[in-house]
């Protein structure tokens, strides 16, 4: 029997908007943003035990760190490379660094498959909980704007980080699988957005969760699709 899955809390962080320097300069910027945002959503959800499965999604990953590492290697040779930069160049570094910071012993996943990484990561966490593989999950979606990321994307990349706490206990927003969309009535078409851009997707979901303060105990519904997401009150 499939479990119902709810988003209990969400949080966001942007170094550019908040103008707060990171305390640990040994970590890459994506790892720093993940740690800051998970800290915030843990406080918002009043999570005492942070040892929960972690799902990190990013379209481009730590491209700035990888580019810096490879640039020195190609231009000056392997002996000139700073070995301390290598951990930051690994794709799953943000998930591992966040796990170490919060002493997470549960599985940690990194999804990086292009512009749909945001919706794919949230959907993967949903499926794990819905099928009773895990009881709750922390989903962290992050992007870094860098020179190499701009070249790949063809434009500037929206930078920031969002975290969502998912579990089976009833919360503000319930996640529904794709097939359920066709059964919904009076879907708010004005709220439909393309889910291709990670930060645009995260911003919409974060606002959807944060703005919902019902007095009658009702919840909202988040329906995941490949092309868009549908939002409605249920």
Regions found by a protein language model. Name each.
Residues 1-107, 112, 116-119, 127-131, ...:
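Conserved "HGTGT" condensation-loop signature of ketosynthase/thiolase-family condensing enzymes
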Residues 122:
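Short-chain dehydrogenase/reductase
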């Amino acid at each position: 029997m499939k479990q119902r899955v709810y988003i209990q809390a969400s949080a966001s962080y942007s170094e550019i908007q908040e103008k707060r320097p990171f305390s640990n300069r040994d970590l890459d910027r994506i790892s720093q943003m993940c740690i800051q945002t998970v800290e915030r959503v843990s406080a918002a959800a009043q999570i005492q035990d942070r040892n929960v499965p972690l799902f990190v999604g990013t379209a481009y990953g730590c491209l700035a760190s990888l580019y810096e590492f490879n640039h020195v290697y190609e231009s000056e040779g392997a002996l000139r490379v700073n070995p301390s930069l290598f951990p930051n160049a690994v794709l799953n570094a943000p998930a591992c660094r966040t796990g170490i910071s919060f002493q997470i012993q549960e599985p940690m996943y990194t999804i990086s498959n292009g512009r749909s990484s945001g919706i794919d990561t949230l959907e993967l966490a949903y499926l794990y909980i819905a099928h009773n593989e895990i009881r709750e999950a922390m989903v962290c979606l992050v992007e870094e704007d860098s020179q190499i990321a701009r070249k790949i994307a063809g434009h500037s990349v929206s930078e920031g980080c969002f975290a969502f706490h998912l579990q089976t206990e009833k919360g503000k927003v319930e996640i529904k699988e794709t097939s359920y969309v066709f059964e919904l009535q009076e879907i708010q078409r004005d709220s439909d957005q393309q889910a291709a851009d990670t930060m645009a997707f995260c911003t919409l979901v974060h606002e959807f969760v944060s703005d919902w303060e019902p007095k009658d105990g009702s919840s909202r519904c988040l329906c995941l699709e490949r092309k868009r997401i549908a939002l409605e009150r249920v």
